[in-house]
Amino acid sequence: MSRVGNRLLSIPSGVNVEVEKSLVKITGKLGTLSVPFDSKKLSVLNKDSMVIVKRANDEKETKMLHGTTNANINNALIGVNSGHTKKLKIVGVGYKAAVNGNKINLNLGYSHPIDLEIPAGLNVTCPQATEVVITGADKAVVGQFAAVIRSKRPPEPYKGKGVAYSNEVIIRKVGKTAEGSKK
């Protein structure tokens, strides 16, 4: 039994939900998001300020789609109402970030700076030179852009230098020591 799929999703005040044939349009103060679903295997109902996702049968694929669709609709409801946020921290001597217009400029120890285009619908800020905050309505786009920034210099296990999520735990390794080596 899919516990995620059977959750009833409450619609926050100020959010409008429209169910079309195979698309759920969710509109709120931060924009409009559309969540597609398979109308042959699932049905989405909008009743009494609640969104209900039901499945047609108990096949394995249908159960998987049931939970995924329910989670995607829930992410969209939260996104258009309060938004999603990812925070990145930059660790390393001379490593820094700055936002210039619709681009983010990263200096990560390479011989050249890295410029990345900020996707539409995202708000990227740098409260400090070693901190990046990404906010937006679409959770997938926020997470994907944070992953792209992190991939430019992932944290290394010896000194922890690189770009990491603010809540990420970096497993550290012990480096080579002069005392421990045998000659």
Swiss-Prot record:
Taxonomic path: Bacteria, Bacillati, Mycoplasmatota, Mycoplasmoidales, Mycoplasmoidaceae
Would you tell me the protein name for this molecule? Large ribosomal subunit protein uL6
Taken from the UniProt entry, a GO cellular component term is:
cytosolic large ribosomal subunit
- List the gene name: rplF
Subunit structure as annotated in this protein's UniProt entry: Part of the 50S ribosomal subunit.
Any idea which UniProt keywords this protein has? Ribonucleoprotein, Ribosomal protein, RNA-binding, rRNA-binding
Q: Which residues cross the membrane?
A: none
Question: GO terms for molecular function, please?
Answer: rRNA binding; structural constituent of ribosome
The family database entries (Pfam families) matched by this protein are listed as: Ribosomal_L6
Indicate the family of this protein. Answer: Belongs to the universal ribosomal protein uL6 family.
Which biological process terms from the Gene Ontology are attached to this UniProt entry?
A: cytoplasmic translation
Q: What does this protein do?
A: This protein binds to the 23S rRNA, and is important in its secondary structure. It is located near the subunit interface in the base of the L7/L12 stalk, and near the tRNA binding site of the peptidyltransferase center.
